[in-house]
């Protein structure tokens, strides 16, 4: 294989489009010159020819169409390259794509003296024309294939060719990779004999921007002879995607009175086209402003950044003078750097003029009047204010303060959150007899502080005159409750105390009468004129109406007003205990086995309704007048309990044992209670008392039998 010159290699690497049949040597479709040079002028002038390009598809150039990599240039039908506007910098390289139904090709225009700029299509090529290409020991020569997206029928369409100068006779080309035998399968194919590469369908750069294919040569059996060699297919972007605003809704806020040039918000659109080209180079503008007052141009948008800023004087951003403190802007984003040929997308930006506290609240009048009955509490008057600020903010919400006339803290004022009114309330009942008139000084402020150049004036204070109305108040007992201590069982008719009630309405000189309101046991009476309370029955500390030795009664004091007013007083009578209750024993029934080894019968307890010292220690005894000493025994356990036991076993029967118990009062109280003892048959852990009733014996008979037994023993 002979070494190739650099020029030959450069030509092969730049070959990217259709090459006609090798038999057709008279006409080669494509540009006659693949690389052209242009000296960078001071400025490219609009509509001034730059150079002429020659393209021939060998079929008459029917429906010839040109595309230029820069939106600032175009190629006329005669092949003349012209600028669309005056421009100074276009980069180092331009690419011109020519296409007819029969052929297409790409020409490179090198700008001598040009500088790199963002967006040059040179970046999409994976090989550098200014760098030497490393020499490789292979005969397969491939160049990147450039295919514009969105091509139309007919398909398949030849897009490039692979050259193998040393390919053995009978060998074939084979193409593999993504888009051939990998998804999306069948997009590309190669003529196994000629090496022509074709595309079978429309490509979409936004779906797949590049395809990495591999070329190799095989023999007739499919065995690889050379390769695989990478073949890159680059999809050239077309401006087929509109800018889209994807982050809405767009809502911005700006404070009223903000200086000119205040940034409100940023609008950002997205374009799916190639960001390295002008197809995705966006420019922003405001298409419409609603409302259009006080100026149709309240805002400006930076065409490149999308920042929306204010452009009017601070005085025009006065929320209180605007018909509507909310503006809606239709924002348009246009690609192709804003040229008329660019695609557009729109979105709505809502801008709210926020309120600041530049208006102080003012009372609607300087003086307010209110009346309230003495003794009443609650709201007595609503104080109204005006404030021009936004009702949804702390710049409008009012805060009221009583700054004078409330030494006893009888009044409070709160803000009604719905109306912003000040609700003045009485929280401690007023007394007409003490003061019939009150004057309060009220101050109103906002929750938020005022701006520095605004202050609270005289209109931010108001005077409230309050008139207290006299009402007939009920008499008041003093003291309340009234307390007295008496011994229970005092004689009927005893005087307990004299109650006293006074009328708060001292200026009315009313008389007071007394009556009983509640006397649960019916023990008391009261003199209606002088309030003397005496007993009508015996007081009993042990009564169910007495709780913790205290008896409670209620009395009424009624004045002579029209209508009369009533006051209630409570009498608490503490009853001292006397020994008027005898103790009682428990239990009163017991069982014992007739053959019991343990002769204990029962443990007795005693209780007494009285209090110490009229209760325990109790004294337990067997009433000896009716019971023999040698049968029963009672023993003291403690102050409240005793043990009853047998001295010998008894026959199965029921026995009544009289128990006498005495308390410790002075004088003491005694009670005798029969203890019923059942002597039962106990066999095999079973207790049988059923037959005991049939042998019921009184203790007197038991005594008789005991005496006979003693006599017979003599």
UniProtKB/Swiss-Prot annotation:
Give the way it sits in the membrane.
Lipid-anchor; GPI-anchor
- Name the lipidated positions (GPI-anchor amidated glycine): 693
Gene Ontology CC entries for this record:
caveola; external side of plasma membrane; extracellular space; GABA-ergic synapse; neuron projection; perinuclear region of cytoplasm; plasma membrane
Q: Which domain of life is it from?
A: Eukaryota
Gene3D superfamilies documented for this protein: Cadherins (2.60.40.60)
Q: Subcellular location, in the record's words?
A: Cell membrane; Cytoplasm
Which ranges of residues are annotated as propeptide in this record?
A: 23-138, 694-714
Q: Does the keyword Lipoprotein apply?
A: yes
One GO term of the biological process aspect:
endothelial cell migration
Signal peptide positions on this chain: 1-22
Name of a matching Pfam family: Cadherin_pro
Residues bearing attached sugar chains per UniProt: 382, 489, 500, 530, 598, 638, 671
Quaternary structure annotation from Swiss-Prot or TrEMBL: By contrast to classical cadherins, homodimerization in trans is not mediated by cadherin EC1 domain strand-swapping, but instead through a homophilic adhesive interface which joins two elongated EC1-EC2 domains through a region near their Ca2+-binding sites to form a tetrahedral, X-like shape.
Role, per record: Cadherins are calcium-dependent cell adhesion proteins. They preferentially interact with themselves in a homophilic manner in connecting cells; cadherins may thus contribute to the sorting of heterogeneous cell types. May act as a negative regulator of neural cell growth.
According to UniProt, the name of this protein is Cadherin-13
**Species whose genome carries this gene:** Mus musculus
Which taxonomic lineage does the organism of this UniProt entry have? Answer: Eukaryota, Metazoa, Chordata, Craniata, Vertebrata
Gene that specifies this protein? Cdh13
């Amino acid at each position: 294989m002979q070494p190739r010159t650099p020029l030959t290699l450069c030509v092969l690497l730049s070959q990217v489009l259709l090459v006609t049949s090798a038999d057709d040597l008279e006409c080669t479709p494509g540009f006659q010159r693949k690389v052209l040079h242009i000296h960078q002028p001071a400025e490219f002038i609009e509509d001034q020819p730059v150079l002429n390009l020659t393209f021939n598809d060998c079929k008459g150039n029917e429906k010839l169409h040109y595309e230029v990599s820069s939106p600032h240039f175009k190629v006329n039908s005669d092949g003349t390259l012209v600028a669309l506007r005056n421009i100074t910098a276009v980069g180092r390289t331009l690419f011109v794509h020519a296409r007819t139904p029969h052929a297409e090709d790409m020409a490179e225009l090198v700008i001598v003296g040009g500088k790199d700029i963002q967006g040059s299509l040179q970046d999409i090529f994976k090989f550098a024309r200014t760098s030497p290409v490393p020499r490789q020991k292979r005969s397969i020569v491939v160049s990147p294939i450039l295919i514009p997206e969105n091509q139309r029928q007919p398909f398949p369409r030849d897009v490039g060719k692979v050259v193998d100068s040393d390919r053995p006779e009978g060998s074939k080309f084979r193409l593999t990779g993504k888009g051939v035998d990998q998804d999306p399968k069948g997009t590309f194919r190669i003529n196994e004999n000629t090496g022509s590469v074709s595309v079978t369908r429309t490509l979409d750069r936004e779906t797949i921007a590049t395809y990495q294919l591999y070329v190799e040569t095989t023999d007739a059996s499919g065995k690889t002879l050379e390769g695989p060699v990478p073949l890159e297919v680059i999809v050239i972007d077309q401006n087929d995607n509109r800018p889209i605003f994807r982050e809405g809704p767009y809502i911005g806020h700006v404070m009223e009175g903000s200086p000119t040039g205040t940034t409100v918000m940023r609008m950002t659109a997205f374009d799916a086209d190639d960001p390295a080209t002008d197809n995705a180079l966006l420019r922003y503008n405001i298409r419409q402003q609603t409302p259009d007052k006080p100026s149709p141009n309240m805002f400006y948008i930076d065409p490149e950044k999308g920042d929306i800023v204010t452009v009017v004087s601070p005085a025009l951003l006065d929320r209180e003078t605007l018909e509507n403190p909310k503006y809606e802007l239709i924002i348009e984003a246009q690609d192709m750097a804003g040229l008329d040929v660019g695609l557009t997308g729109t979105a709505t930006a809502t801008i709210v003029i926020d309120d600041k506290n530049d208006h102080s609240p003012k009372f609607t009048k300087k003086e307010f009047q209110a009346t309230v009955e003495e003794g009443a509490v609650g709201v007595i008057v609503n104080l109204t204010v005006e404030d021009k600020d936004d009702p949804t903010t702390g710049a409008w919400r009012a805060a009221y303060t009583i700054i004078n006339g409330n030494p006893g803290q009888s009044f409070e004022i709160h803000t009604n959150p719905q109306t912003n009114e000040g609700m003045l309330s009485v929280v401690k009942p007023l007394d007409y007899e003490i003061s019939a008139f009150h004057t309060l000084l009220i101050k109103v402020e906002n929750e938020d502080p005022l701006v520095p150049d605004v202050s609270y004036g005289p209109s931010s204070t108001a005077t409230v005159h309050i008139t207290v109305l006299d009402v007939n108040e009920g008499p008041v007992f003093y003291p309340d409750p009234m307390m007295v201590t008496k011994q229970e069982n005092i004689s009927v008719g005893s005087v307990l105390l004299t109650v006293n009630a006074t009328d708060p309405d001292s200026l009315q000189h009313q008389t007071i009468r007394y009556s009983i309101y509640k006397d649960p046991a019916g023990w008391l009476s009261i003199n209606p004129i002088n309030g003397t309370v005496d007993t009508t029955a015996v007081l009993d500390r042990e009564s169910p109406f007495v709780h913790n030795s205290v008896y409670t009664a209620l009395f009424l004091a009624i004045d002579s007003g029209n209508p009369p007013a009533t006051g209630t007083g409570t009498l608490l009578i503490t009853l001292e205990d006397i020994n008027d209750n005898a103790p009682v024993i428990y239990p009163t029934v017991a069982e014992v086995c007739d053959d019991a080894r343990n002769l204990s019968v029962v443990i007795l307890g005693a209780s007494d309704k009285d209090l110490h010292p009229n209760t325990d220690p109790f004294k337990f005894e067997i009433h000896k007048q009716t019971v023999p000493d040698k049968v029963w025994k009672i023993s003291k356990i403690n102050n409240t309990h005793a043990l009853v036991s047998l001295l010998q076993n008894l026959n199965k029967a029921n026995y009544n044992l009289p128990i006498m118990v005495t308390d410790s009062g002075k004088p003491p109280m005694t009670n005798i209670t029969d203890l019923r003892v059942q002597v039962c048959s106990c066999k095999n852990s079973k207790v049988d008392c059923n037959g005991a009733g049939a042998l019921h014996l009184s203790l007197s008979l038991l005594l008789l039998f005991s005496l006979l037994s003693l006599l017979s023993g003599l």
